[in-house]
Amino acid sequence: MEIPVREERRSSSSSAGPLQQTISLAADDAIDSGPSSPLVVKVSVFETEHETTKLIHAPSTLLGETTGDADFPPIQSFRDAKLVCVVETSKLWEIAAPIAFNILCNYGVNSFTSIFVGHIGDLELSAVAIALSVVSNFSFGFLLGMASALETLCGQAFGAGQMDMLGVYMQRSWLILLGTSVCLLPLYIYATPLLILLGQEPEIAEISGKFTTQIIPQMFALAINFPTQKFLQSQSKVGIMAWIGFFALTLHIFILYLFINVFKWGLNGAAAAFDVSAWGIAIAQVVYVVGWCKDGWKGLSWLAFQDVWPFLKLSFASAVMLCLEIWYFMTIIVLTGHLEDPVIAVGSLSICMNINGWEGMLFIGINAAISVRVSNELGSGHPRAAKYSVIVTVIESLVIGVVCAIVILITRDDFAVIFTESEEMRKAVADLAYLLGITMILNSLQPVISGVAVGGGWQAPVAYINLFCYYAFGLPLGFLLGYKTSLGVQGIWIGMICGTSLQTLILLYMIYITNWNKEVEQASERMKQWGAGYEKLEKIAT
């Protein structure tokens, strides 16, 4: 009775596309192999037949579960393409949505700190805004960039089945980021003279410098927080991050009210609440890793002290790549502040950047998701799955960006009312709306491409590309158009758009010519190099 059933299944799958046939046949082989026999699945990777007898526990994009080890076969029909799109879309948003929500909650910690401080006084609000946007934002971007090396290493190690190395990589990153935080201490300690040197009013700089020294513990919390985040992201364990972010934001609001409104601690209370919330997030994530991530966490290990120098170089390349992007937009604001009528120029640009920042939170989530997808699939030896995940993500992100741009253009005369009642400011914002729309489209692609770069381990070349496109092309062009023509703030922004466009085109071309089979081989070599301690851990475990 078993044979006719199997023949019927194979017959029914013959009319489907190659992708669906592979799924059906793989499932048949799994059923017929029996519970006691090893699973043997024939899959097509690198255009040749391979037999795999050991499943890798990276998430399979083929079956949508953790029971598959096959790469996607080539797409040969619209039905195949549709199935790939459905599977990849599901995988993408399972990761991206919780990460985006977590980022929104973290952004809310800063926002509510400013809101509560704003009720203390305008001077205090200006001082805290400077402390958070200049000093804290600088260290935030640099530490986040340093931790991004884990997106490459943990993601590919997870795909390759080297689960024990995930905890080692995380501990190694903890050490490096804690050391980096020590190096960044002078920026906090000497914030007051540095801010005065940058042209800030002495009274504001004095208060800002005092607040900055009080939030030093928050910086060290980030050194623990970021590597732990990347550890969880690489395994797609992002739901817990969203819950921790939500409870942390709720607790932060309560502590702010308690310290500022009840205890009347003023700025000291705001700084204390900021530190407590940051460490609460870091500790909660570590507790979850130690208690519920037994596959990746095997306890503290001396292996974390091995290969620190090459790990540091990859971390530094990741930091430079990210910081060049963050500082690019900060520099645009600085240039705008030296134009005629800087109040309207900076105000209108800040409103547009604020709107762009809210859209950016979504794409930061997508950035992390595609980084996880690419690194997992390369580590698993799935070149087509990596390629298809990139294609699907780029298309969907572009559609979202276009929709956002259309909404901005339709409401260009009205959306600024959220931020200001000034008719002059609203008109200035409306004049910039078309540039905001173009920027939103570009920003729908740029984070995705950066995520692919991190997932593939391309940080160093992308850092050079960013340096050229942003600082050798975009900023000089913006300076010329803004100061040497009558375009003003629009000219500066056009220069920024040109730099971002050039960077996006270059990276899209890099992805277009990428040999994904070769990327799999490089990922395998990287795991052999970086996972030197994996065999030691296996021996210890046995």
UniProtKB/Swiss-Prot annotation:
Domain of life: Eukaryota
Membrane topology category: Multi-pass membrane protein
Annotated Gene Ontology cellular component terms: membrane
Membrane spanning stretches: 97-117, 127-147, 176-196, 204-224, 240-260, 272-292, 316-336, 344-364, 390-410, 435-455, 462-482, 491-511
Keywords: Membrane, Transmembrane, Transmembrane helix, Transport
GO molecular function annotation: antiporter activity; xenobiotic transmembrane transporter activity
Entry keyword annotation includes Transmembrane: yes
GO biological process: xenobiotic detoxification by transmembrane export across the plasma membrane
Transmembrane helix in keyword set: yes
Family: Belongs to the multi antimicrobial extrusion (MATE) (TC 2.A.66.1) family.
Name recorded for this polypeptide: Protein DETOXIFICATION 34
Lineage of source species: Eukaryota, Viridiplantae, Streptophyta, Embryophyta, Tracheophyta
Gene symbol of the encoding locus: DTX34
